[in-house]
């Protein structure tokens, strides 16, 4: 049942995921870090791919499902990295901390600090029952990766023999 309606389910999962992130940012003022922003990219690519799949008939859809698979791998890379950074296991990218230039005065230093709004990647800004958003995203992308692989294999993995 899940695999039969996979395209619609994937669209709903992706739409909820990206909508949740945007609502958290713009309505609840939970500013994303650099890794959070990179974890949104797969959902945008998945949604665009699904629009092509839904709209264009006689399209080689396997290419788009493979693109979705690559998007899931990309997202898993960044979400696993983010979970590692949050748990102080891995080091975050340089954009996740404030880089200040040498200043000649305290007022210049203060101006630099106040002009930069940098959200640290190692701080959990939101969690659900103790599970960070990056961890939830890892699980969602893992489900997408596994179910999309099953869908690809069932629909495109083996040649179906026709009765002659």
Task: Name each model feature, range by range.
Residues 115-164:
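A hydrophobic membrane-anchoring alpha-helix module
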Residues 20-25, 74-89, 107:
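C-terminal TM-helix exit segments that contain a strictly Trp-centered aromatic cap at the helix terminus
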Residues 2-12, 52, 56-76, 146:
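Interfacial segments of alpha-helical transmembrane regions
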Residues 30-41, 94-97:
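Non-cytosolic membrane-interface motifs at loop->transmembrane helix junctions
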Residues 35-45, 110, 129-143:
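Membrane-interface loop-to-helix entry segments
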Residues 13, 17-20, 46-49, 71-81, ...:
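Membrane-embedded alpha-helical transmembrane segments of multi-pass integral membrane proteins
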Residues 87-132:
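Extracytosolic (periplasmic/ER-lumenal) interhelical loops and adjacent juxtamembrane/interface segments
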Residues 37-52, 102-104:
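Iron-sulfur (Fe-S) cluster-binding segments and ferredoxin-like electron-carrier domains
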């Amino acid at each position: 049942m899940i695999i039969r309606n996979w395209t619609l389910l994937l669209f709903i999962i992706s739409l909820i995921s990206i909508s949740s992130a945007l609502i958290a940012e713009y309505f609840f003022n939970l500013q994303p870090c650099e890794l959070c922003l990179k974890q949104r990219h797969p959902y945008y690519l998945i949604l665009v791919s699904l629009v092509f799949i839904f709209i264009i008939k006689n399209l080689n859809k396997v290419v788009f499902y493979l693109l979705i698979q690559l998007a899931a791998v990309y997202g898993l890379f960044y979400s696993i990295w983010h979970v590692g950074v949050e748990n102080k296991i891995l080091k975050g990218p340089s954009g996740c901390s404030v880089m200040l230039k040498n200043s000649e005065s305290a007022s210049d230093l203060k101006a630099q600090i106040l002009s930069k709004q940098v959200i640290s990647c190692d701080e959990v800004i939101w969690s659900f029952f103790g599970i960070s958003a990056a961890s939830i995203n890892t699980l969602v992308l893992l489900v997408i990766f596994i179910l999309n692989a099953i869908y690809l294999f069932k629909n495109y993995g083996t040649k179906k023999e026709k009765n002659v």
